[in-house]
């Protein structure tokens, strides 16, 4: 608030207080992202969510998102199954590739494998989530032949979403697995995502899956009035957008601009949408 960064440890403690307050006022869900850079505090969402589970009663607790591409799908499931047990069935996971890529060199992964890592790890996670002995093989890890994963969830499958940054390929991937989808509206207008929502509905039907929930994510700020919220929020939003623009190039933003900041995605898929 005073223009100086807040220490990461303090941010984490404040987030726990926010989770408690969200539970007290009756919000449905509380999610935290996974980042591995100086301007974000949460690098281990499941550890935070376990702490939040012990301090809340009803609110659902999830990631937003877990960067599956640079993690182990089996460990992701195990950690969220643990949070689910601690919270008595309130855990859910949101899977994504992440628009930030710091985790790839940090964990010894090659960005050239960006596509195949998510493809294969999502396939493996889906098998683990079914809570049956796993038989799987791919290019990114050794085969698994008939092993089981523990702990299992008590009463249900682990609720899982896929976060999508705004490309048809990602929408089709989500529909192929029949998962609920959340659109990350980082920039631009919500209306620009309407065609993707239509594509998701169509693809879910083509793949033979029952329709699942759709949701959106968008940055925001709450104040006493809309004008006050804009005045308080815009300088910080602008600073972050321009910082990302400097890192990723060439975009910067001002009050007349709204830029979609993301990574191009390409994917081969046998689904062909109807014209």
Which ranges hold each PLM region?
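Hydrophobic faces of well-ordered beta-strands that scaffold small-molecule active sites
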Residues: 1, 30-32, 61-64, 91-95, ...
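N-terminal beta1-alpha1-beta2 module of alpha/beta enzyme domains
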Residues: 1-61, 156-158
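Active-site mouth loops of central-metabolism enzymes
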Residues: 1-13, 64-74, 154-166, 221-223, ...
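Short, solvent-exposed loop/turn segments at secondary-structure boundaries
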Residues: 6-8, 41-43, 73-74, 106-108, ...
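Acidic-and-aromatic substrate-binding clefts and catalytic sites of carbohydrate-active enzymes
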Residues: 36-44, 68-74, 188-193, 222
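Short catalytic/ligand-binding loop motif for oxyanion handling, primarily in non-cytosolic enzymes
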Residues: 39, 101-103, 170, 223-226
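Internal, glycine-rich beta/alpha segment that forms the wall or movable "lid"
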Residues: 69-179, 191-198, 202, 206
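An alpha-helical appendage that flanks or caps ligand/catalytic pockets
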Residues: 112-149, 190-275
């Amino acid at each position: 608030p005073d223009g100086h960064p807040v220490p990461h440890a303090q941010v984490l403690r404040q987030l726990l207080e926010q989770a408690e307050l969200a539970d007290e006022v009756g919000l449905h869900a509380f999610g935290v992202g996974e980042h591995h850079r100086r301007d974000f505090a949460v690098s281990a969402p499941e550890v935070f969510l376990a702490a939040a589970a012990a301090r809340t009663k009803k609110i659902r607790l999830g990631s937003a998102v877990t960067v599956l591409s640079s993690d182990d799908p089996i460990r992701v499931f195990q950690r969220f199954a643990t949070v689910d047990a601690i919270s008595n069935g309130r855990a859910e996971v949101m899977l994504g590739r992440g628009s930030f890529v710091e985790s790839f060199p940090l964990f010894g992964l090659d960005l050239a494998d960006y596509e195949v890592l998510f493809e294969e790890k999502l396939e493996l996670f889906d098998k683990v989530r079914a809570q049956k002995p796993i038989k799987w093989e791919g290019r990114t890890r050794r085969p698994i032949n008939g092993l089981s994963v523990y702990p299992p969830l008590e009463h249900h499958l682990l609720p899982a979403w896929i976060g999508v940054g705004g490309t048809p390929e990602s929408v089709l991937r989500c529909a192929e697995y029949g998962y609920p989808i959340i659109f990350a509206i980082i920039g631009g207008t919500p209306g620009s995502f309407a065609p993707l929502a239509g594509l998701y509905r169509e693809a879910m039907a083509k793949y033979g899956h029952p329709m699942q929930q759709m949701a959106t994510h968008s940055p925001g700020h709450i104040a006493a009035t809309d004008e006050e919220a804009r005045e308080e929020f815009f300088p910080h939003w602008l600073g972050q957008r321009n910082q990302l623009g400097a890192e990723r190039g060439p975009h910067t933003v001002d009050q007349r601009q709204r830029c979609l900041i993301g990574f191009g995605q390409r994917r081969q898929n046998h689904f062909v949408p109807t014209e």
